[in-house]
A protein has these predicted regions:
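Short alpha-helix in the alpha/beta-hydrolase fold that links the catalytic acid
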Residues: 270-272, 401-408
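Alpha-helix boundary/capping residues
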Residues: 274, 412-415
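Conserved strand-to-loop "acid loop" that flanks and positions the catalytic carboxylate
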Residues: 390-396
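Alpha/beta-hydrolase fold active-site neighborhood
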Residues: 237-370
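Hydrophobic, well-ordered secondary-structure elements that form the walls
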Residues: 55, 394, 408
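C-terminal structured domains
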Residues: 391, 409-413
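Gly/Pro-rich cap/lid or specificity-loop segments adjacent to the active site
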Residues: 10-242, 349, 356-364, 374-382, ...
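Eukaryotic N-terminal low-complexity, Ser/Thr- and Lys/Arg-rich leader segments
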Residues: 1-8
């Protein structure tokens, strides 16, 4: 793979431009300042095209907050904006006792030159679209972040907190610009440094099968419901309000919820309302169609689909890895007489069935075939890591293989882990203040594990 440490604008001494910073404004318990920066689309060509990157600064109402150091939040995904600071609670409440928190909309998301089909078609043909999207992985997310740090905190490294894919970004940050980091906290997101997309899915499918077993053990009545629903959708032209056809495979994608606490119950209660009586026949209910559509975030968060496998690619093509593993080793997932849910998985057929993705199909195939992806981690730099990194690793995490996480943690100095089966992938949201406090203590040596 092409090396990660390619020259960027920052290494050339070229500063980015802060376009705007709002006046402080308040919501209950919080003061917010919105910042927008202009950064190079390609950090290797700082004089070329620019995009915007948005960061929301969040402080408590203590007048001394402006003197607190920064904590940069790296969001999960890929393809999601930073959390919206609605109220002072959970991990944010703990963070604000000693930090100014920066909610960072990574490039392509939220208010940071968001990628959607309406914008992407303006890039030109499928090749131009794919070339544009190649710039939206974690390496450039990190380059943006470090350039912003050089502007907002030029003399002081900052701390980071990474949720899920935010941990991928953290490990890339430690590879590219460790000098910008004081300490890092990772929740359910330590990647295997050398693991390919294919290896990821070979490890994921057994977890998903087990979650299916647990689900149908808890809700045995749902097997018959799902088989009935799948047959109905195969035999009838059922449509979402936006005109997309409702197919059984989209129902299978509800299994994404298995990776979060208490969300299997949400699936069960949604299935209760799958049908409604219309005269002398049953039809799929509007309630179910709207619930299913709301659960599938691919239409509003297309990066989650189009770059999902690319976050593992380093010098090789992702090649629709999940689809290949499913067809070769788990063909029974296609048998609707024995209905099984998928997990966090992306398939090429989605680009035929989901409106917002249809126009990205050619670009998605180009990206899946692309084998020139540069490296995302520098194992030599990581082998000499001096930045304290504290991680929460969830033993039963359906999204991030704990065995792969352990491989990385054991190979990188100054990484400490709290291994637990108490939380699912959403531990930061559920464990909040308590779990973040535990990782702070772990990272700073107050506790051993």
């Amino acid at each position: 793979a092409q090396g990660i440490r390619s020259e960027d604008a920052l290494s050339r001494g070229i500063k980015i431009k802060r376009m705007t910073s709002s006046n402080p404004y308040r919501i209950p318990g919080l003061e917010l300042i919105d910042h927008t920066f202009e950064v190079p689309l390609d950090h290797g060509n700082p004089g070329g095209r620019k995009i915007n990157v948005f960061v929301r600064e969040v402080c408590d109402l203590d007048p001394k907050s402006k003197d607190k150091p920064f904590l940069l939040f790296l969001q999960g995904g890929p393809g999601f904006r930073a959390p919206l600071p609605i109220r002072k609670e959970g991990w944010l409440k703990r963070a604000l006792t000693e930090f100014r928190v920066l909610m960072y909309d990574t490039r392509g998301n939220g208010l940071s030159s968001a990628v959607d089909y309406q914008a992407l078609v303006l890039e030109g043909d499928a090749r131009a679209q794919a070339d544009y999207l190649k710039h939206f992985r974690q390496d450039n997310i990190v380059r943006d972040a470090e350039a912003i740090r050089a502007e907002m905190s030029p003399d002081t490294p900052w701390s980071t907190i990474g949720q899920s894919y935010g941990g991928w970004c953290t490990m890339t940050y430690l590879s590219l610009h460790p000098e910008g980091l004081k300490e890092c906290f990772i929740f359910g997101g330590v990647p295997g440094l050398d693991r390919t997309a294919r290896e990821i899915y070979e490890g994921t499918f057994p977890f998903v099968e087990e979650r299916n077993r647990q689900y149908f053990e808890k809700f045995p009545m749902d097997k018959e419901r799902l088989v009935k629903l799948a047959r109905h959708l195969q035999e009838n032209d059922v449509r979402f309000p936006n005109g997309d056809r409702v197919i059984p495979q989209l129902v299978q994608l509800l299994g994404l919820k298995f990776g979060f606490a208490h969300t299997a119950e949400e699936i069960h209660f949604l299935l209760e309302e799958a049908f409604v009586q219309a005269g002398d026949q049953e039809i799929v209910s509007h309630t179910f169609k709207m619930g299913l559509q709301a659960a599938l975030r691919f239409d509003t968060n297309p990066i989650f689909a189009i770059l999902h496998e690319a976050i593992y690619a380093q010098g090789s093509a992702s090649a629709w890895a999940c689809d290949a593993v499913q067809k070769e080793s788990y063909p029974h997932f296609n048998n609707f007489e024995d209905f099984l849910f998928y997990g966090e998985m992306v398939f090429p057929w989605m680009f035929d069935e989901i409106s917002e993705l249809k126009g990205m199909k050619e670009a998605a195939n180009i990206l899946a075939d692309y084998d020139g992806w540069p490296a995302l981690y520098d194992k030599d730099v990581l082998s000499r890591n001096t930045v304290p990194v504290a991680c929460a690793v969830y033993a039963n995490d359906m999204f991030v293989n704990a065995r792969f996480s352990r491989e990385t943690i054991e190979s990188v100095p100054n990484m400490k882990a709290f291994y637990t089966s108490e939380y699912e992938h959403c531990g930061l949201r559920v464990g909040g203040e308590h779990l973040f406090s535990r990782l702070i203590d772990l990272g700073r040596g107050e506790v051993e594990r």
